[in-house]
């Protein structure tokens, strides 16, 4: 490109870049490309032609205006008419246009050529600068310099891991040119605390406008990442090393106090304060605040911050409530001790203590504590009040309690538990509301966990399954909540006849159950699996875990079907003294709830199962009579009432296959397949007609799931010529069961069992019972007593 008088004009007329981005180097390239002489314009106007010479070219050639932002307004004003007249000129400046004279000159030059903006170096450019192809070295320099050309070059001139003298000198020179406001901002930015505008203004004593202007100056001066507001890491390192430790601690403490005063997010700053081992009162408050902020999203980190706060001088009592909440989410709080709370924290402390009690499985105590926890606590207390039969109190507190929509929905759902068909949709709505916002509290129990037993009671295990799966996927309630929901899911599937999940979850989670509610779940799962496998040895093991749970005498309505498993285990191992008090407590709770039909049927079914387990025909008749007088609206309850009548007939030896078949279908259709198979098996054993017995045994096998085996790793290989069925019979004989019990478990008639036992004895060559048991030990590879 040429001017009217033949002079060459560069294609680029304006170069924009921060200090150290290579503006001067780029100017030199453009001058060299023009092939002529260049005249540099000095701060005093040297190099400028006389006004009378306009529009002639200056005698020296191309006018070069470097660092135009530093030129006095008068010099810039003299350059404007030259540019307007077409004088060949190229200008380099910082990104910020500092005055009207520079703006006018910039506009004139931009009209005659292109504007080039110098961008940070990329990885390819840094690799070229380093002269090596080591990707980690390139990445390190690129990260430390943010692609700033001069900083990257200075780093490249030093050995890896050492300070660059060139960079230190550059930063010191740049710092000396800054005004006091920009220097103060630079030193606080070097702390790497990502301070908000108001906090930065507070610590530097500047207004928001002054602080923002200082950041702009620092960006133009090459101190701050051109694409952000953070200081270039390598520059920050130099500034930090340039300050005495005492000065750094003072700066950090000033930031800590400002963050607390502003109510800002202190977590990022807390990391830096800890890194410099700040132990001032303000730092201690920052650590405590960080623990509070993180207790729900990252309870493990929250506990670490609370420890830091105590180490820095915070009274441990001030961390107790937060520590308890974080511990609840992690499942590390085992006992319900008094949680200290002072002043405004007193109600909060009571709510947390009430939640601790709920997680310990003590709903009554939880309700009492939560009722003292202010308006929010009273709303949180409603499910526990309903669970323990304090229904009128629950209604009153639900009406008076104040809190978010999710908790009001949860209270409404809890009040509706007498009618599962109405309650479950409300629990779902509460769960959805809870998922849309942050509650800011650990729940005594989640909507999903409360909905599960109610849905199962209503014959809707699939909804319970779905809700619990959703809670697990979302991590609701932290690690402890996931653990709890997984155990509940295993129990739901156990009740629905899906034993595989119950076996695997119990194996994975049973040993780590810490809270009282989870120990109850584990005991119920253990007892339920042993009951369904017919394994008396494992039932005794399960009872050993269940007995301490029952001894607590803490009963609530949501536990009713869980307690069925434990009480049946007590009956089976002849521990009747544990049964009466629990049944009485359950009856009291159901009565205080107004004996809602669904729960009344469930309680009556529990009585029936205990009578069947105890082989008490008279008690079976009494329980059946009680159930048949009820008129439940739900299909599951109607199926249970009909089955109760058939149990009474079957145990009396009156087997009517035509009457029994629809009852079995009803139980299976309402997700009680194991109960149906058990009734069919007992009817088959008592049937006098071989054809009827055969039909019922086939039906029992259809209804039965695969045999429950608690130790999935244990396998028995056929030995001594025993068939697969004979090995099954041998295992049950070794566990001490009678022929009748074996027949009930395997859906075989006692005669068939007797035939199998005789064949096994013959194959093993045993002539006495002692020899027979010894031979079984050899074949099965375990002691019968272990069973």
Features from the language model and the residues they span:
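Short capping/hinge segments at domain boundaries that bridge a core fold to an adjacent linker or tail
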Residues: 24, 76, 166-167, 192-198, ...
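Extended alpha-helical scaffolding segments used for macromolecular assembly and cargo binding
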Residues: 12, 249-330, 657-669, 673-679
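Alpha-solenoid helical repeat architecture
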Residues: 198, 226-227, 264-267, 316-322, ...
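Amphipathic alpha-helical "lid/sensor" segments that cap RecA-like P-loop NTPase cores
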Residues: 132-170, 183, 223-226
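Helix-turn-helix DNA-binding segment
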Residues: 698, 711-787
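Winged-helix-like regulatory helical subdomains adjacent to P-loop NTPase cores
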Residues: 162-195, 203-206
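Amphipathic alpha-helical segments of tetratricopeptide repeats
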Residues: 220, 310-311, 337, 341-344, ...
